[in-house]
Amino acid sequence: GVDVEPFGRDHATKGGSYDTGKRIAREVYDIDAPVPVPYDFINRTGDTKKMSASKGTGVNAHDVVDMLPPEVVRYFMLRYSPAKRLYFDETDSLVRLVDDFAAMKQHPQNELDERLLFLCTDGLSHPAVSSIPFSHLVISYQAALCDTVKTVEILRRSSEYARIVDEEEAVIVKELGYVSRWLEKWAPESLKFRLA
């Protein structure tokens, strides 16, 4: 059976769908209802209303997982209490989000960080966030004319990142795919450049 049931806070209102389901579980199936975990909504930064794909104010899940590594999506969702409203910004703040995750991955500050890191990476066979800051990859990738092979070579020649490239080349290549898609679809013009 199901032990825990997360759902949007609108389903947690008195007399809402959770209360109805709880009665059905008890009176029809003679089972205990799952433990409820209501969560708040995700808004786009600057919006006061929850995202809604039907109203054109949302970001669809497919786009999010195409632009962000799965461990970062989990980090975004799990780093705060489910009761806290989250604000998603696919532009500038996305770079900071990936960099924050990478920093926590490299140097967890406490047991809570270690637990969060486990939850973000559990079951992922191929990590997609390297030890090189995403912000640096965004710049390096564009400086290398958006060529993954050239970007890796530039990073390898850097005294700061050579060892990381040797240890994490496959992860870096995978992460550069996210960089490329983000630059193409969501990056603000202020972060884009082209060398002539």
Regions found by a protein language model. Give the residues of each.
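Short, well-ordered coil loops that connect the C-terminus of an alpha-helix to the N-terminus
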Residues: 30-31, 70
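C-terminal accessory/binding modules appended to enzymatic or scaffolding proteins
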Residues: 195-196
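Glycine-rich phosphate/pyrophosphate-binding loops
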Residues: 31-43
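Extended, charged low-complexity segments
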Residues: 190-192
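Divalent-metal (Mg2+/Mn2+/Ca2+)-assisted nucleotide/phosphate chemistry catalytic cores
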Residues: 1-22, 28-29
